[in-house]
Amino acid sequence: MLRPLGWQILLTPFYSMADQLSYVFITPAALRKGRAGGILGRLISRSGLELHTGRIFAPSAKTLGELAATLSGQAKTAAYLKGLSAGSQSLVLVLKGEDAAAKVSSIVGNDDSMNGRGETLRDTFGDLVESAEEGGKTVYFEPGVIAPASAAEAAAGLKLLASASDSEGGILDAASTFSGSTEKTLVLIKPDNFAFPNTRPGGVIDLFARTGLALVGFKPFHLSVAQGEEFYGPVLDFLVEKLPDGRAQWESIIAFMSGKRPSECTPEEKTLPGTQPCVALIYQGPNAVAKIREALGSTNPANAAHGTIRKEFGSTIMINGAHASDSVENVARETGIICLEENDFKTKIAATL
């Protein structure tokens, strides 16, 4: 039976209704080198904040300059942003919760906190090389991750990013960074990774980094029951044919992903966003579908290979860490069902600021 006792309790929202947002800007170098998962995992687990939204950006020179201007007291960071090539792909994560700006700033660090022993995210994921012979002159500076120092700076940066999110963000394209043909594939980080603030969501992304694929799409969302019915529609006939309680098993899958069983909902309730947090990722590169499926592992975690997502993070056939599309055709079908192209980044920010 695929309906484990108590999962509804474990996966109910664990965040209070806080009213402050902050953000982190994961730099192009950190994104390209597969550091985004480590950054996300530590950020969530250390802060206890909600991952409110996020988006891949390819910011223009104008946006980079204006973002730099919102960061006071971080001269190196401001100069770094202004010096980035326009269109360099980066990842913006928006965190929500009590004292979000102060918590995020403390965890990420700033220009003056990059020579410690891993106390801040910049310690671990950034690099600062200074020349002792030249009076501490900066030889190399790569922050890895950038955060505003105050709620006012966070609000200014978020408004700027929200306004640019249509034209400079979304599901981007990294084909030019690979030789030969590429394809895109979809991953869903499942709700079991969000039972409490922990490193698991970042750990999933971290393990996918070994594929060498480019992360070109990122969207936290809540699957509705109606979307779940359509998404998992193709497996209903199989379950009904193979199992005496096949339909009940199918409803359990949808309830796990959305928070409610279809038979418990009115037609109107089915269309509402679910209660269970998920994150959709788009990866791009040669043979992306096959590479992601290999890194994901067998549906049953007990049979999954060592080092795969499902071996590391799964516990049952249903609660198994992540979903990945099994064909290019299903990538198109599944991304359409969850409305991945829709930009809710700016609406979520506008609703809170």
Language model features with spans:
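Non-catalytic terminal and connector segments of soluble metabolic enzymes
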Residues: 13-353
